[in-house]
């Protein structure tokens, strides 16, 4: 008992000592804010989430060129359009398709009937809903424009669904991936011919005496979606030429520009920049006059003419390497472009000379060998220089050749008074060659139409695995001979656009996170 009392006394003394040593902690230097502590002297605002740094973007535009996306084909103005408008589907630089305005789609079992529905949340900058009528009117108007019409070759009808909520596309041949062609910006049905129609994109064009700007849409239907452009207002600088665009980028405030190295007006950039190369769809090629040229009477020449075309040297000498030499009608990075197959038809002067030995060169009534006449558009100086060099090279290898340089290129082309022509065309994203080979096709002059190649083209549209067979047959036949493929060059001030991922016709490409499989409705069985 005495030990127990002694223990209690010791504990009591210890408690007293501890209480005497305890100091009251002064918490007045800290202010609780829920998820953070502020040090003495700090304001609560100091720990507020920081807004993303302003980019202070400035873009160039041509005020005298169209800003209606259904008619405006200028690639500088289309930079603005990629922020002002949205398509049913966006296509990245690798040809991957992502839904934007499309909220759902159906496809028939035979892939010839496609139905698309607008995302029910989609709105224009004025708050009105995007409708199926708008989509239909947009595509009907786009079909009239040379810039888009090549993607409509196999679309034979477009109508609203019975309930008016969707748009039906009827095709004359099965399509594996019709959405790849449906990246046309959608505008209101009542504004398809407006100078600057309203769009559903994150920015709206505003003009004033103090200058034009792109202003961020405050209540954008996509909310706070992160896109490459973050400014609330983007300044615009009016320009008048490609050289002006370059100078505004190199010495002025312009942040992002797009150029076409295959254009006669291309201005070279000589400053510090970040660069993206985006396939443009522009293909330079040779077309043969099978119907009227004596050089192609027996079809021999076109089977080996490809070996006499020094594509790599032409691309380097006349475009400073800013074009891709090709022997197949597709961009080299395309999944359809088979390099092993392409290499079989590349430049080989020895093979050309060897094959030329078994070819009978036509002669005139005096026994003089006829020149192979190369028609070329005299308004394209780079193409003229290539045609001249080609004529010189062929002549040196034993095939006399000369150029026919015409300012009225189309008239001479339709007259078909040439042997071959050095042409330029813009292929759709699926590299459709229909107009070369279908009966009475717009690009079939000189007898290029060909039933077998036309059917093989349709087979490739139905199943992309058939492109190899199509390209092999075409390269062996040689009625059209690809020379080089172009790309756009997108320049940005270094470090300014870390999230930029430009695509053809869509410099400010972005995705909403939707997927094709996620919005597909059950297949329709006929």
Put a short name on every predicted segment.
Residues 43, 50, 402-409, 434-497, ...:
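Extracytoplasmic/peripheral linker and loop segments enriched in polar/acidic and small residues
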Residues 323-361, 379-383:
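Structural transition elements
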């Amino acid at each position: 008992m005495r030990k127990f009392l002694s223990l209690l006394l010791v504990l009591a003394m210890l408690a007293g000592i501890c209480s005497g040593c305890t100091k009251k902690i002064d918490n007045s230097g800290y202010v609780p804010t829920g998820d953070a502590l502020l040090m003495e002297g700090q304001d609560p605002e100091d720990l507020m989430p920081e807004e993303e740094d302003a980019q202070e973007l400035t873009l160039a535009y041509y005020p005298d060129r169209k800003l209606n996306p259904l008619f405006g084909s200028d690639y500088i103005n289309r930079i603005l359009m990629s922020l002002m408008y949205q398509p049913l589907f966006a296509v990245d630089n690798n040809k991957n398709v992502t839904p934007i305005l499309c909220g759902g789609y159906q496809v028939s079992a035979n892939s010839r009937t496609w139905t698309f529905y607008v995302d029910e949340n989609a709105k224009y900058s004025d708050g009105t809903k995007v409708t199926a009528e708008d989509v239909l009117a947009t595509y009907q108007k786009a079909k009239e424009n040379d810039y888009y019409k090549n993607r409509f070759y196999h679309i034979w009808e477009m109508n609203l669904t019975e309930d008016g909520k969707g748009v039906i596309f009827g095709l004359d041949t099965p399509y594996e991936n019709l959405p790849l062609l449906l990246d046309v910006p959608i505008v209101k049905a009542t504004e398809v011919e407006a100078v600057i129609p309203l769009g559903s994109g994150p920015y709206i064009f505003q003009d004033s005496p103090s200058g034009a700007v792109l202003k961020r849409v405050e209540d954008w239907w996509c909310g706070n979606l992160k896109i490459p452009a973050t400014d609330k207002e983007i300044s615009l600088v009016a320009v008048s030429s490609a050289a002006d665009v370059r100078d505004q980028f190199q010495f002025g405030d312009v942040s992002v520009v797009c150029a076409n190295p295959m254009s006669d007006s291309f201005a070279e950039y000589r400053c510090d920049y970040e660069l993206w190369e985006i396939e443009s769809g522009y293909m330079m090629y040779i077309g043969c006059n099978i119907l009227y040229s004596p050089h192609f009477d027996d079809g021999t020449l076109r089977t080996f003419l490809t070996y006499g075309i020094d594509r790599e040297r032409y691309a380097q000498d006349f475009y400073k390497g800013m074009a891709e030499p090709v022997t197949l009608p597709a961009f080299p990075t395309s999944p359809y472009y088979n390099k092993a197959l392409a290499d079989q038809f590349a430049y080989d002067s020895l093979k050309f000379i060897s094959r030329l030995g078994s070819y009978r060169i036509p002669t005139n009534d005096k026994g003089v060998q006829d020149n192979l006449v190369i028609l070329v558009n005299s308004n394209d100086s780079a193409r003229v220089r290539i045609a001249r060099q080609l004529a010189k090279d062929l002549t040196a290898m034993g095939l006399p050749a000369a150029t026919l340089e015409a300012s009225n290129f189309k008239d001479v082309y339709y007259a078909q008074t040439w042997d071959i022509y050095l042409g330029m065309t813009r292929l759709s994203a699926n590299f459709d060659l229909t107009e070369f080979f279908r009966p009475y096709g717009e690009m079939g002059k000189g007898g290029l139409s060909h039933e077998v190649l036309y059917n093989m083209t349709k087979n490739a549209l139905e199943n992309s695995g058939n492109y190899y067979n199509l390209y092999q047959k075409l390269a062996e036949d040689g009625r059209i001979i690809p020379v080089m493929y172009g790309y756009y060059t997108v320049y940005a001030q270094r470090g300014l656009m870390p999230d930029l991922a430009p695509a053809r016709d869509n410099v400010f490409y972005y995705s909403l996170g939707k997927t094709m499989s996620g919005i597909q409705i059950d297949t329709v069985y006929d």
